[in-house]
A protein has these predicted regions:
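Gly/Ala-rich phosphate-binding loop of Rossmann-like dinucleotide-binding domains
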Residues: 24
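Active-site beta-to-alpha loop of glycosyltransferases that engages the nucleotide-sugar donor
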Residues: 2-21, 36
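Active-site acidic Asp-centered loop
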Residues: 35, 85-87
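Catalytic-site signature of metal-activated, phosphate-bearing donor transferases
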Residues: 64-76, 91-157
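Active-site-proximal specificity loops/subdomain of glycosyltransferases
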Residues: 3-4, 18, 40-85, 93
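Hydrophobic residues within beta-strands of alpha/beta enzymes
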Residues: 30-31, 82, 108
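Short beta-strand/loop segment that forms part of the nucleotide-sugar
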Residues: 28-36, 56-57
Length: 157
């Protein structure tokens, strides 16, 4: 089954090259929802992922309930596996278990932190190879507390 990522963005030209280079290898398709960016974000997406869709958000502010509804509406336009990620998130894992049956999996989050402001990074290397300090949440904690992400192949209501 096809895997589609949905991502909202606003002026993310700094982080988008890492997000796109990484996730284009994981997902078959992407839908990038532009919250009226004024930087080069759209051009970067077109350059690095020319087959991905870029849509202008129907929202003019970033209210959680409106964002969630818009993402659900976009996800429902596609068959297969769907996942929403922020531009700061990189999906890492083995997804060979994803089959053709409707299902949902919760994927725990990993947060990358680097307190060394002097460390220079380049878009030519994966970010996780340059920022090597991170942490995960205890696997026994509630998924909502851990900010887990859902990859699913079922329609959302």
């Amino acid at each position: 089954m096809k895997k589609t990522v949905v991502c909202t963005f606003y002026n993310e030209e700094y982080i988008l090259p890492w997000f796109l280079k990484h996730n284009r290898e994981v997902f078959d398709h992407g839908v990038m929802i532009d919250y009226h960016s004024t930087d080069r974000s759209r051009e970067i997406i077109k350059e690095l992922c020319p087959t991905w869709d870029i849509v202008m958000s129907r929202n003019f502010d970033f209210q959680a309930d409106k964002v969630d509804r818009e993402i659900m509406d976009v996800e429902n336009q596609f068959d297969g596996w769907k996942m929403c990620l922020n531009a700061t998130e990189l999906l890492v894992g083995d997804y060979s278990i994803l089959g053709d049956q409707p299902w949902q999996f919760l994927v725990p989050s990993v947060f990358m932190v680097d307190c060394d402001k002097e460390r220079l990074v380049t878009h030519d290397l994966p970010l996780y190879e340059q920022k090597t300090f991170g942490f995960t949440f205890d696997t026994q904690q509630n998924f909502l507390e851990r900010r887990a992400r859902s990859i699913h192949s079922i329609p959302v209501q």
